[in-house]
Regions:
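Non-catalytic, usually N-terminal nucleic-acid engagement modules in DNA/RNA processing proteins
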Residues: 1-184, 297-300
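C-terminal extensions of enzymes
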Residues: 1-15, 23-30, 38-40, 144-150, ...
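Conserved, mostly hydrophobic/aromatic
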Residues: 21, 55, 90, 132, ...
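A non-catalytic, amphipathic alpha-helix used as a structural packing/dimerization or gating element
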Residues: 127, 131, 135, 158-169, ...
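Generic secondary-structure signature for well-ordered alpha-helical cores
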Residues: 137, 168, 172-175, 241-244, ...
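Glycine- and acidic
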Residues: 149-152, 157, 217-223, 332-335
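Glycine-rich phosphate/ribose-binding loops and adjacent secondary-structure elements
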Residues: 161-164, 173, 177, 185-306
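Surface-exposed helix-capping loop/turn segments at secondary-structure junctions
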Residues: 173-183, 247, 353-365
Length: 377
């Protein structure tokens, strides 16, 4: 259940209660694609040191390896990972349309080949729900088609209509699965996904249509896939007035610190992105003064922490010079330390956004940090 505590402009401060714990909103979901965050980050790190409230795992990848039935046999993702806070699983749709080979889209679902071994696979709304039920996640995402941007108007119209029909099937199947004896999580929630490319009218009509289904939450999908930032913000502005006020709002795959601040200002509650972990593994460090690349020669003898304004475990214990040395020496510890710092930074960013909303000074926070956090230093 989502409770809206207060607003400042369109920005929202709330509490989201789930069967696996309460989440303070707005929040960032740390991305553990294959039930692990790349960079050697364990569930113990996430819970004890990195201020993580919720993790995101990937249905497509877990279905292929180790297999959702194996995860079910192990007691579901929470037991498998030893992670006892909320987990969101995406539907697999994005990966089917971005990674899989030789896909064929039909009304019943999608036929495709595994990107791993070429094996023929079928996934439709019911199959996606069954896989996510086996995983036992807190929140399941509906199976949808994520169209390329730009795409022809007629194709996007037809795709959205099919995505709506798939969503109705997802809802029906989720209700059936949750009622079965032996279901790992009989309280599994379902979020619908708004699509429509960059066409305002399709986006709005699709959001109005799926808002009538009374789902547990709603996402804006199909953005942050190459379109200009201004276009993404415009789509959020168009769609947000039609999203239910009493349900969490999720912007999928976003983004930079500035993207998050600006999207919170537009009424978004939930975010996920591989950026903090992926960029960290290549030496890109987020700080409260901007973005630095730790392998630059300027940091060879720099005794400061990665961010002097950060109190994460890495910044409390290691210097820029040391972390730079680890990257240059190609030590595995380099990526782990950088990922730990960046994830802590993102979760701390959300904590500070929530605090600013609590204290009625979010706009001041936005003015101070929105541009600063994305600049190169």
């Amino acid at each position: 259940m989502f409770t809206l505590l207060k607003t400042e402009g369109h920005a929202r401060r709330g509490v989201f209660e789930t069967v696996h714990g309460t989440i303070q909103t707005p929040f960032f979901m740390n991305v553990g694609t294959a039930a692990a965050i790349k960079g050697g980050i364990s569930s113990i790190d996430l819970a004890d040191q990195l201020k993580c409230q919720i993790e995101l795992c990937n249905t497509y990848h877990l279905h292929l390896r180790p297999g959702d039935k194996i995860v079910r046999q192990m007691g579901g993702l929470h037991q498998f990972m030893n992670w006892h806070k909320p987990i969101l699983t995406d539907s697999g749709g994005f990966q089917v349309f971005s990674l899989a080979k030789l896909r064929r889209i039909k009304e019943e679902g999608v036929y495709f080949q595994s990107h791993i071994d070429g094996k023929a696979i079928f996934m439709g709304p019911e199959e996606s729900m069954q896989i996510q039920s086996n995983l036992g996640s807190t929140i399941a995402m509906a199976f949808d088609e994520c169209v390329e941007n730009p795409a022809p108007l007629d194709y996007v119209k037809n795709s959205c209509a099919r995505t709506t029909r798939w969503l109705v099937r997802c809802q029906k199947e989720m209700q059936r699965l949750n009622s079965l004896e032996g279901t790992i999580n009989p309280h599994q929630m379902l979020f619908g996904i708004n699509q429509g490319g960059t066409y305002d009218a399709i986006r709005v009509s699709h959001m109005q249509e799926i808002a009538q289904l009374g789902l547990d939450g709603y996402a804006i999908g199909g953005l942050a896939v190459g379109e200009p930032t201004e276009v993404m913000y415009h789509i959020i502005d168009e769609v947000e007035p039609h999203m239910p006020v009493d349900k969490p709002r999720y912007l999928m795959g976003v983004g930079t610190p500035s993207n998050i601040i600006e999207s919170v200002a537009r009424g978004v509650d939930m975010f996920d992105c591989v950026m903090p972990s992926r960029n960290a593994r290549h030496g890109t460090i987020f700080t409260w003064d901007g973005i630095l690349h730790i392998t630059n020669a300027a940091y060879e003898t720099d005794s400061q922490p990665l961010d002097p304004k950060c109190d994460c475990p890495v910044c409390r214990n290691h210097s820029r010079a040391y972390v730079r040395h680890l990257f240059k020496a190609k030590e595995q510890l380099a990526g782990r330390l950088a990922v730990m710092h960046n994830l802590y930074f993102y979760n701390k960013l959300m904590e500070r956004i929530r605090q600013a909303l609590d204290e009625g000074r979010f706009e001041e926070f936005r003015r101070t940090y929105s541009e600063r956090l994305d600049r190169r230093i």
